[in-house]
Regions:
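Gly/Ser/Thr-rich loops at beta-strand to alpha-helix junctions
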Residues: 1, 58-59, 80-82, 138-143
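General structural feature for long, well-ordered alpha-helical segments within catalytic domains
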Residues: 16-19, 35-42, 57-64, 68-71, ...
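Short, solvent-exposed amphipathic alpha-helical segments in soluble enzyme
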Residues: 4-6, 66-71, 92-93, 150-153
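Glycine-rich, aromatic-lined ligand/substrate-binding cores of catalytic
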Residues: 120-216
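A structural signal for short, well-ordered beta-strand segments and their strand-loop junctions
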Residues: 12, 53, 74-77, 133-139
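Catalytic or ion-translocation cores adjacent to nucleophile or general acid/base/metal-coordination motifs
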Residues: 2-45, 77-122, 156-167
Length: 216
């Protein structure tokens, strides 16, 4: 959604079809596909912001993108890579097969996950060399392969906070969240409107809030 709200094209790879469908139903993703060629064709034909949730494993998909010479402008990863056992599905396994292996041989499962993470990170590094802007999103993907697979070069691409948020902190700007304990969506609109009045000069913030009100 953040990509499409900035008029970008997004290919989001997810191993669980239910999660993609849920995002489509709630408006966070435009369409689901289980075929890479179809997904790329949809993005190629899209006008304006558009997102495709591709059913697949990123450790398979990203090396294939690199092999085809497809270089995304931006790459990040939001798997729960900090949790080897339950946060990452190894390549070559369906969800059901992964569940069975996790139960029957957890050590093998962890090793399969780490092997997939190595492929995943190497593809990120390869695409970075070809021009993609890459960043980690604080999920420890880089740390897992650096610690368990002797891959220190994983840290050749930065974390999101040091690269992008910390400079904003230096300007006195940063993430700010609030909640309406009333449960009334109108109260969120009221706080949005108050913020727009408070900082009338911030065009980017105004654009973002108006788009969020339409989409979320």
């Amino acid at each position: 959604l953040a990509v499409t709200m900035n008029d970008g094209l997004c290919l989001a790879v997810e191993v669980d079809s239910w999660r993609i469908q849920r995002r489509v139903e709630t408006g966070y993703c435009d369409v689901m596909s289980d075929n890479l060629d179809e997904a790329l064709d949809l993005l190629d034909k899209a006008e304006g912001g558009y997102s495709v949730g591709l059913l697949g494993n990123i450790a398979d998909v990203m090396p294939e993108l690199e092999r085809r010479g497809i270089v995304p402008d931006i790459i990040t990863d939001q798997t729960s890579a900090h949790d080897l056992r339950f946060g990452y599905i190894p390549a070559g396994y369906s969800l059901e097969e992964a569940d069975e292996l996790r139960e029957s041989d957890p050590v093998k499962y962890d090793n399969e996950v780490l092997d997939s993470m190595v492929v995943h990170v190497q593809a990120i590094l390869d695409l970075k060399k070809k021009g993609s802007v890459c960043f980690d999103y604080g999920n420890n993907l880089r740390g897992q392969v650096a610690d368990h697979r002797d891959m220190p070069q994983a840290f050749d691409y930065p974390g999101f906070v040091p690269a992008y948020i910390r400079p904003l902190f230096c300007k006195g700007a940063g993430p700010f969240r609030w909640a309406a304990l009333s449960g009334n969506p109108a109260d969120i609109t009221a706080t949005d409107d108050a913020l727009l009045e408070l900082v009338p000069q911030n065009e980017a913030l105004h654009r973002w809030i108006h788009k969020a009100q339409d989409k979320v």
